[in-house]
Amino acid sequence: MRIIIVCYPTFGGSGVLATELGHDLAKRGHFVHFIAYQKPVRLNEDNRTIFFHKVNVPFYPLFNFQPYELALSTKIVDVASKNKIDLIHVHYAIPHAYAAYMAQKMLKSSKITLPIITTLHGTDITLVGKHPFYKNAVKFSIDKSNIVTSVSKSLKNDTHEFFNTNKKIKVIPNFVDIKKFNNQLEMCKNEDDIKTITHVSNFRPVKNIRTLIKVYSKISDQFNCKFNLIGEGPELEVAKSMAKDLKIKNIDFMGNTNEVEKVLCHSDIFILPSKTESFGLAALEAMASKNAIISSNRGGLPELNINNKTGFTCNYNDIDAYVEAILKLLTSEKLLERFKLNSYKQAQKYNIENIVPMYEAEYKRLIK
């Protein structure tokens, strides 16, 4: 098949998932055309069946805000027309599904059929989509997509509730390449006996970074640990300032990385205290690296992180509950090791080899 994938090119979960999906589809013999405003951070173009098409938005002084959706739609039409594309798979409803629908209509006038599959990732529904400015456009985009998928049952239910839509939504969870993480685990050697607690995110307010830093501070006062924070975003400088003011020891703000598995393999506990989280791809990658998981109980996280089995779930703003959960693991090597092993077993259920065929089946259903 010849497939267009439209995604955000950033370190966020939707862009990472879309990129890894494209890589695996190419390995399976499909031709994959990525469209975005810049090259996705994890995109590897070494495979001759992967192509990247940049969306350029020409500046025109009449517009206070340059029309990205129009430029994206035009690029989709151009790529689809020149490459005999079978379908388009958009990740994140706004503006991608909306732009895909406009492109679909333009192509129809040239007697070219372009079916749309839209994957909902979370904040496109729970935050952006609920905003009055965007709600009608999001609902329209969902209803006009040929197939809609979501990354968790929680997100599926939220979508039906928020938008009062009867659109059928198929749950296809996020995935992880277990083989890649296994290879890293085999090479990984702990440098010392100090336990490491890690967080990975895009440092947006929804990730609840300020609560995280307060949790780290209380743990630091009671236990000798390392604290790793991977990622960048709007709350990063606030987090650094808080860590300095609270005099947290052994904390490392590591920035963005394309090789998160090299950090996670040295980690023991992963914490994700998000205010809302449709799935928690970062937590899944930590599970594949044999980390016990401490997370909030919001959104799709309880579907992934099974309380008292792979880790603990807490109310998102309950600092004391997070601290208590972490200390239970730090003071019981037996419990920590059991949770780490359970996490790894849970991650295997989400192996890329199990999940990508689910997308392929939907593609075949679209073009049959």
Residue ranges and their predicted role:
Residues 5-11, 18, 23-68:
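N-terminal strand-loop element at the rim of the active site
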Residues 61-87, 97-98, 102, 132-136, ...:
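An amphipathic, basic-hydrophobic alpha-helix
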Residues 149, 190-216, 228:
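Conserved donor-binding/catalytic core segment of Leloir-type glycosyltransferases
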Residues 154, 175:
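Carbohydrate-associated surface elements
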Residues 256, 275:
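Aromatic "clamp/platform" in nucleotide-sugar-dependent glycosyltransferases that forms part
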Residues 292-295, 305:
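Short hydrophobic beta-strand element within catalytic cores of glycosyltransferases
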Residues 307-308, 312-319, 328-333:
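Conserved acidic donor-binding segment of nucleotide-sugar-dependent glycosyltransferases
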Residues 321, 328, 335-349, 358-361:
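A short, well-ordered alpha-helix in the C-terminal region of glycosyltransferases
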